[in-house]
């Protein structure tokens, strides 16, 4: 089914049972992952992120609901069918999961051996993948001879070996330093752009979402509390969990204690306004100047994401009450 999404969850719940105790990890998840997109799934520890990934590749079975991959059900079908579908899904792990006794080339070749590829074809594919991830010179190196970033690139190449249509990256950069994280994320974007692979990025880091995701699903207590474009979630988060994640990386709105400090420092009225490509503050500040209202930018920041601008600015407005009210009205009308 060419028009089917890459993955679709319909009212999916997952309950783990230990003796007589039950723990619901995911609650009635409805989620459609489009072909060719990078979807970020973010949440704190215990939110259900990894369970969601394991449901996609059939390593866990849902307690209720249905899951389809590329239009094909993976629930209520024989295990042999699930294994067949799993061949079209690549997996990247946080701890690399490389065979220490195999070289970089040997690790990449392993799934091709399992799939029954002939030797000559395997060797050609391994060489192609090593070049793609920039590790041609490390073909004969063992994992202990590689840096963390190089190990993860081997893991990515291995995940791509059989040309899957879907790639699951579960905390793939959590064990890496910031510079190496950037390199791995750039590689994921390259895979998506050049190979057309759909990617699901599981993470607890909003910087990762900002760097690669087209859309983001925010998980909290086993529920999707927000699902929107990455820009929309950053520019105007609707849920408290999304706002908390955005605040960890942007810092463009003063926290309550910072707002109290600013209030003590400035005699004017403090107001925080959101700005973006369509909502500037130039006209409102012109109104302020003409009305004799003094203004000062005391906090804030502006960012660019997906070729669009957004941010928040906190102003101190000082002047006659009616003039300040006129400026506030102008800001509200933007």
From Swiss-Prot:
Alphabetized PROSITE patterns for the sequence: ABC_TRANSPORTER_1, ABC_TRANSPORTER_2, METN
Chemical reaction(s) catalysed: L-methionine(out) + ATP + H2O = L-methionine(in) + ADP + phosphate + H(+); D-methionine(out) + ATP + H2O = D-methionine(in) + ADP + phosphate + H(+)
Disulfide bonds: none
Binding site for ATP: 43-50
EC assignment: 7.4.2.11
One cellular component term from this protein's GO annotations in UniProt: plasma membrane
GO MF assignments: ABC-type D-methionine transporter activity; ATP binding; ATP hydrolysis activity
Subcellular location: Cell membrane
Domain of life of the source: Bacteria
Keyword Translocase set for record: yes
Signal peptide positions on this chain: none
Subunit record text: The complex is composed of two ATP-binding proteins (MetN), two transmembrane proteins (MetI) and a solute-binding protein (MetQ).
Record's protein name: Methionine import ATP-binding protein MetN
Gene: metN
């Amino acid at each position: 089914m060419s028009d089917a999404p890459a993955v679709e969850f319909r009212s999916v719940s997952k309950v783990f049972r230990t003796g007589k105790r039950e723990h619901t990890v995911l609650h009635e998840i409805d989620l459609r992952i489009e072909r060719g997109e990078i979807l970020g799934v973010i949440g704190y520890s215990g939110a259900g992120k990894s369970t969601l990934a394991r449901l996609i590749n059939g390593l866990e079975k849902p307690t209720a609901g249905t899951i389809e991959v590329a239009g094909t059900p993976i629930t209520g079908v024989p295990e042999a069918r699930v294994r067949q579908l799993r061949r079209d899904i690549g997996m990247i792990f946080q701890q690399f999961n490389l065979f220490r006794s195999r070289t970089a080339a040997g690790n990449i070749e392993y799934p091709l051996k399992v799939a029954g590829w002939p030797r000559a074809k395997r060797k050609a594919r391994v060489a192609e993948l090593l070049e793609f991830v920039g590790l041609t010179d490390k073909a004969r190196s063992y994992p202990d001879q590689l840096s963390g970033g190089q190990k993860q690139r081997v893991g990515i190449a291995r995940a791509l070996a059989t040309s899957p249509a879907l790639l699951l990256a579960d905390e793939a950069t959590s064990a890496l330093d910031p510079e190496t994280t950037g390199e791995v994320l750039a590689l994921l974007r390259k895979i998506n752009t050049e190979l057309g692979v759909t990617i699901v990025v599981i993470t607890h880091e909003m910087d990762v979402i900002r760097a690669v995701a087209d859309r983001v699903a925010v998980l909290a207590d086993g529920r999707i509390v927000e699902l929107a474009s990455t820009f929309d979630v950053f520019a105007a988060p609707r849920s408290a969990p999304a706002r908390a994640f955005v605040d960890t990386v942007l810092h463009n709105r003063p926290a309550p204690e910072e707002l109290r400090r600013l209030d003590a420092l400035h005699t004017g009225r403090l107001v925080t306004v959101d700005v973006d490509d369509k909502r500037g503050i130039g006209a409102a500040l012109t109104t302020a100047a003409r009305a004799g209202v003094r203004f000062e930018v005391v906090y804030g920041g502006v960012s660019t994401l997906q070729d669009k601008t957004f941010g928040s600015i906190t102003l101190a407005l000082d002047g006659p009450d009616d003039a300040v009210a006129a400026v506030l009205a102008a800001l509200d009308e933007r």
